[in-house]
Amino acid sequence: QNGFSQDDLEVLAGITGQAGKAVEQATAHDEKVAQEQFKRDLELANRVQQGLLPSVPPEIKGFEVFDFYEAAHQIGGDYFSYIPLGENRLAVVLADVSGKGVSAALVMAALSADVRYTLAIEADVAKAVTLLNSSFMRSGWDDRFATFVVVVLDSTSDVVKVVSAGHLPTYLRKADGSVETVGLEEAGLPLGVDPTFVYEAAEVNMIAGSTIVLYTDGISEAMNHKNETYGLTRLQEVLSEPADSPAAVGRRVLVDVERHAAGQVRSDDMCLVCVGRPAST
């Protein structure tokens, strides 16, 4: 004998059933609350990300600037900015933080502030990126890293300085349509990989009609319905086509990427910056 009558067992069964339903309802409620909180966090992260991006291209004597940014459905860590460095100089910055979601957006926001600080206190752009990398490592972002590239323009000089920290190749489109990779030998590791790494700057002579092209992997890795990436070869081919301004170069790239993707849902933010010298008239 277990001490329970049939009536007792029926009552216990009823209580158990009610308790089970109560637990299910509580779990469903908790999940709904968690989903709503996650949605609010994503919306906040998206607003933070959008607030850090430039609203219009800058003006700097002797240069024309075109930019494009479009967020993917998932929040990513793409970031670009224009940072004045005194009366005649301007830094064009582009970065891609590893990962997605709220945490990537937070790392991007911190990196954005750090970039402005290091470029403000260190005039030598290569040394500034070396300081930036050390700061990134000290921040303790676990296994996060960021690819990064900065181009420093000077309205009093034809020489442009480029420092790349593991970012995708920087391209120089010359006035004759030829395309070359900039700073391949000087390119360094991504930020957050080696705290002792020392970065180097490449120098590029930009004459009238030439354009420097910066982009994130939302461009180069855009997928079509066959799961084929857009790729760097196709990008270089499009860059070599006739174009009379940085805006024309940029729009031609965007049209071709869209043609390739043909409406496929993107998983990465798409960022493109083209900086050029006006063509001689």
PLM feature segments, named:
Residues 1-3, 23, 97, 278:
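Short beta-strand-to-loop transition segments that serve as allosteric relay/switch motifs
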Residues 3-24, 109-110, 207-208:
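Amphipathic alpha-helical "output/dimerization" segments
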Residues 122-128, 241-250:
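Short, charged, surface-exposed loops that flank catalytic or proteolytic processing sites
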Residues 12-16, 167, 250:
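N-terminal membrane-insertion helices
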Residues 29, 33-213, 259-281:
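… and, occasionally, acidic/histidine-rich disordered N-termini of signaling adaptors
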Residues 1-15, 100, 200, 220-232, ...:
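Regulatory loop-to-helix N-cap segments in sensory/regulatory domains
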